[in-house]
């Protein structure tokens, strides 16, 4: 049973072989329609990949020779049988003897001739091999290398490609280079030392020191290990030391997940580490129908679990990015099959008309509107795939951050990057159509948004006259904008623009999967310098023409095309053979075209996988660890509503546990539940929380001075320490906005974010205290934590409400029922009569003329003295009970005016 369960688990954890199935379909279709290649089928009629190896050719020839020899034998036996039966009575014994002797002589001669031929062929092959080894090299090894290269070229999956590449490294001696640590391309000593330190701390289970090493040493390009030149010396992979470092990093995170460190503390440190490393974005360029090349790239990264969370697209890249970003992981295989089976019609006006009639329609449209195609078919296709989803809805559905670039049609606006932050209610299909509106090809298109309440569609800017064109014109790869918004510092670019990628083929950054010598690398570098010089000169000429007023709009757009950056840290490019298919640039894609581009995209991504794994391995591992910790915090916390996380400093945090009395007697618990009202519109959705983390200053709140005291208890009880002040209520709820002047309902939250504005205790009324307390006005460091205090039992009947009509009296008339918790220096200085118990009185009103008195109680003075945070109570907020529970009046009375009497509420906290 256990073996079956393990097998089932292993099959469930296997990656979805999306690209492999599509590549197999491509070869099946190509081989089935080709006249020169015959598909090979096994006995079960299953397709077998054709191979151009010599071994396959020899096997086929050998099988053919056997079949020919068998046929000859069958024919000879048949003829002899017929002759024997026909002449059986006519042959005598002498003739039979002569015939047998002749047959024996013929067989002996044929045997001798066959042996001589075999000896001659073996001798010739030996001589050829000897001469080749003397003057050229190892003949047999070169033949084997050719066979393995053919296997690598015709691989149908990434695993087959990797195995063929590793075998090539063994045959060519590149494995020795990978095993050798020393290289001038990176700091091997630093990486080796850090790897050994992490392994030592992990094996010794010194988790605090291991976490410190991770926090202070993990960066993306440690010791220049991200140098792309490290990946042009082998067919697959790079130095084994780098692979060992990445493996040890994953093992370190796995050990921390199983450690006894506090989840909130561990979560904060890992979030800071991820912010220090940065974030990766996948950027897809335009390129007409050749943009379907991106499907193979996304499919490969998806099945290898290397797909970044931030995805951006322009023009054709926006189509692919939007369709794949709005679907769940389980929907991707079905989606790809639907794309293959669909018959697209984007560039043809009317299918029922002939080509000449459609051409006349295009010519008339071009002279009338200045565009060659109409975008109505594109709009219908995008609505079919995307529906009326907005950027916010797509993010809430899949968690992917979709970005689409559009360029303004005029000179008076700036290029825009549309996502769920800048355009949350914009319809994605309208953004895609605007990003595909290449001047002269498609007309400019407006952006539409959906009203979140009514669902009504309307122009985004309020006017349909504001239109946008192809995003590739001004910002094909929005690298700087992504860096500003999402802390992106690493770009994986896929470039298929027909006027760009041939020049990028000469760039040094486009390496991986192929062996390049120093001469080729230097030649590429020189050619790249020449290209940059010519581009700068052309940009200068265009600037001069634009300033002179010669076709200012056109020259400005052309200058933007030449001046922008088209490559990233890792750039995936198609093969140069795409240039010979330029006539398919603006044609409706067929099934064969789709399969070919998907196959080319997948095979172009395979050489970059090892670079992506080493560049982004720690980042993706941290993302998984952070998600795992957040999920564990949700499961282990006794929470009744997820909306409380919307206002916490980090997205998810544990709530304090109830006391033993409260757990035994839930009826006596002071837990208050909040009921939403009509006036309370501040109800956030967890999925609409911050995309990444809070501000960088807020993350410092999770750094504690003594991390060793926050480990897990052996008994199973895990103490949870809030990053804010302690509260009597064991639940963290949101507070209403301070700008609301109406009476506040019974609130449930005593916890304020340390980064939130100053609480009401700092704005104490001067009419009561005379002057503000200097101690309470001091702000503590952003990195100091406030430890929770043990809550005492509270009897709601022992306290009374303050009526609205009461006037404020002197401190000498204070009732003995009201007490103070800890003796603050200011209160001791004002009047010692105030201090008699463990309660704190303060005002909770923004208006000094009509303050509202509230009471803080149930704080343990011993715990407060021990915590050494006596002056930091300013973050607590206690909301009162409803006025209907008031029974007696208090000697502290206030007289609000009649105009504001209904706005003030005085109560005590349960």
From Swiss-Prot:
* Region annotation Disordered: where it falls in the sequence: 51-120, 657-683, 713-777, 874-910
Q: Which residues carry this modification: Phosphoserine?
A: 55, 737, 749, 751, 836, 890
Compartment(s) of residence: Lipid droplet
Q: What else is known?
A: Present with 195 molecules/cell in log phase SD medium.
Q: Where is this motif: GXGXXG?
A: 286-291
Q: What is this protein called?
A: Triacylglycerol lipase 4
What EC numbers are recorded for this enzyme? 3.1.1.3
Organism, per UniProt? Saccharomyces cerevisiae (strain ATCC 204508 / S288c)
Q: How is it modified after translation?
A: Phosphorylation at Thr-675 and Ser-890 by Cdk1/CDC28 stimulates enzyme activity in vivo.
In which residue ranges is the amino acid composition biased (Polar residues)?
70-85, 666-683, 739-768, 900-910
What keywords appear on the UniProt entry?
Hydrolase, Lipid degradation, Lipid droplet, Lipid metabolism, Phosphoprotein, Sporulation
SUPFAM superfamilies annotated for this entry?
FabD/lysophospholipase-like
Q: Which residues form the PNPLA domain?
A: 282-483
Cellular component (GO) terms are:
lipid droplet
């Amino acid at each position: 049973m256990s073996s079956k369960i393990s097998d089932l688990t292993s099959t469930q954890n296997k990656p979805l072989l999306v690209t492999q199935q599509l590549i197999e379909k491509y070869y099946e279709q190509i081989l089935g329609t080709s006249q020169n290649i015959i598909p090979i089928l096994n006995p079960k009629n299953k397709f077998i990949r054709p191979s151009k190896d010599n071994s396959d050719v020899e096997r086929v020839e050998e099988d053919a020779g056997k079949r020919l020899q068998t046929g000859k034998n069958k024919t000879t036996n048949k003829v002899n049988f017929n002759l024997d039966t026909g002449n059986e009575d006519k042959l005598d014994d002498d003739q039979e003897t002569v015939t047998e002797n002749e047959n024996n002589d013929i067989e002996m001669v044929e045997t001798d001739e066959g042996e001589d031929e075999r000896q001659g062929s073996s001798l010739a092959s030996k001589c050829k091999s000897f001469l080749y080894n003397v003057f050229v090299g190892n003949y047999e090894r070169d033949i084997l290398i050719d066979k393995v290269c053919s296997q690598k070229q015709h691989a149908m999956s990434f695993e087959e490609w990797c195995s063929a590449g590793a075998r090539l490294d063994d045959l060519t001696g590149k494995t020795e280079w990978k095993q050798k640590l020393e290289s001038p391309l990176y700091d091997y000593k630093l990486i080796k030392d850090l790897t050994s330190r992490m392994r030592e701390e992990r094996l010794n289970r010194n988790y605090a020191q291991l976490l410190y090493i991770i926090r202070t040493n993990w960066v993306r390009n440690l010791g220049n290990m991200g140098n792309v030149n490290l990946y042009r010396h082998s067919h697959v992979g790079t130095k084994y030391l780098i692979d060992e470092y990445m493996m040890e990093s994953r093992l370190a995170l796995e050990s921390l997940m199983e450690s006894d460190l506090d989840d909130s503390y561990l979560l904060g440190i890992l979030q800071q580490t991820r912010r220090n490393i940065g974030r990766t974005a996948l950027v897809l360029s335009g390129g007409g129908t050749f943009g379907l090349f991106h499907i193979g790239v996304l499919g490969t990264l998806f099945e290898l679990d290397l797909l970044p969370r931030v995805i951006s697209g322009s023009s054709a890249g926006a189509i692919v990015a939007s369709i794949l970003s709005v679907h769940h992981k389980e929907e991707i295989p079905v989606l790809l099959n639907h794309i293959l089976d669909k018959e697209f019609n984007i560039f043809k006006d009317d299918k029922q008309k002939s080509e000449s009639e459609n051409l006349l329609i295009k010519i008339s449209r071009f002279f009338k509107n200045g565009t060659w195609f109409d975008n109505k078919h594109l709009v219908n296709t995008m609505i079919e795939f995307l529906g009326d989803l907005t950027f916010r809805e797509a993010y809430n559905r899949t968690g992917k951050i979709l970005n689409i670039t559009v360029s303004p049609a005029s000179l008076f606006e700036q290029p825009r990057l549309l996502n769920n932050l800048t355009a949350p209610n914009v319809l994605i299909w309208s953004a895609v159509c605007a990003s595909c509106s290449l001047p002269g090809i498609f007309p400019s298109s407006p952006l539409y948004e959906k009203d979140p309440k009514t669902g009504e569609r309307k122009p985004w800017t309020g006017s349909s006259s504001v239109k946008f064109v192809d995003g590739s014109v001004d910002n094909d790869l929005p690298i700087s904008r992504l860096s500003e918004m999402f802390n992106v510092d690493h770009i994986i670019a896929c470039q298929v623009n027909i006027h760009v990628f041939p020049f990028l083929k000469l760039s040094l950054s486009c390496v991986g999967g192929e062996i390049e010598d120093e001469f080729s690398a230097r030649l590429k570098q020189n050619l790249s310098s020449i290209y940059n010089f010519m581009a700068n000169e052309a940009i200068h000429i265009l600037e001069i023409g634009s300033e002179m007023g010669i076709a200012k709009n056109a020259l400005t757009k052309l200058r933007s095309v030449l001046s922008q950056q088209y490559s990233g840290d890792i750039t995936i490019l198609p093969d140069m053979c795409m240039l010979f298919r330029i006539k398919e640039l603006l044609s409706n894609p067929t099934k064969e075209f789709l399969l070919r581009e998907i196959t080319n995209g997948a095979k172009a991504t395979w050489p970059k996988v090892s670079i992506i794994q080493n560049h982004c391995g720690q980042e993706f591992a941290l993302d998984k660890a952070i998600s795992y910790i957040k999920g564990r915090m949700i499961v282990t916390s006794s929470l009744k509503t997820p909306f409380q996380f919307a206002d916490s400093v980090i997205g998810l945090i544990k709530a304090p546990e109830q006391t033993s009395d409260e757990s035994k007697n839930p009826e006596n618990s002071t837990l208050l539940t909040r009921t939403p009202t009509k006036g309370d519109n501040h109800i956030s959705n967890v999925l609409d929380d911050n995309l990444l983390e809070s501000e960088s200053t807020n993350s410092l709140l999770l750094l504690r001075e003594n991390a060793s005291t926050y480990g897990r208890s052996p008994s199973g009880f895990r103490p949870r320490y809030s990053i804010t002040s302690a509260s009597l209520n064991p639940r963290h709820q949101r507070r209403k906005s301070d700008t609301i002047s109406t009476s506040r309902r019974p609130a449930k939250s005593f916890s304020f974010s340390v980064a939130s504005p100053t609480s009401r205790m700092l704005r104490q009324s001067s009419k009561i205290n005379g002057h503000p307390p200097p101690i309470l006005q001091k702000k503590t460091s952003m990195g100091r934590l406030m430890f929770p205090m043990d809550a005492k039992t509270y009897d709601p009947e022992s306290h009374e409400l303050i009526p609205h009509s009461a006037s404020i009296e002197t401190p000498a008339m204070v009732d003995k029922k009201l007490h103070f918790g800890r003796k603050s220096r200011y209160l001791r200085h004002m009047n010692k009569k105030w201090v008699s118990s463990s309660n704190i009185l303060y005002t909770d009103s923004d208006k000094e003329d009509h303050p509202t008195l509230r009471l803080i109680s149930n704080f343990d003075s011993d715990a407060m003295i021990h915590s050494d945070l006596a002056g930091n109570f300013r973050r607590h907020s206690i909301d009162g009970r409803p006025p209907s529970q008031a029974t007696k009046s208090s000697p502290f009375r206030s007289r609000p005016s009649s105009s504001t009497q209904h706005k003030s509420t005085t109560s005590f906290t349960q």
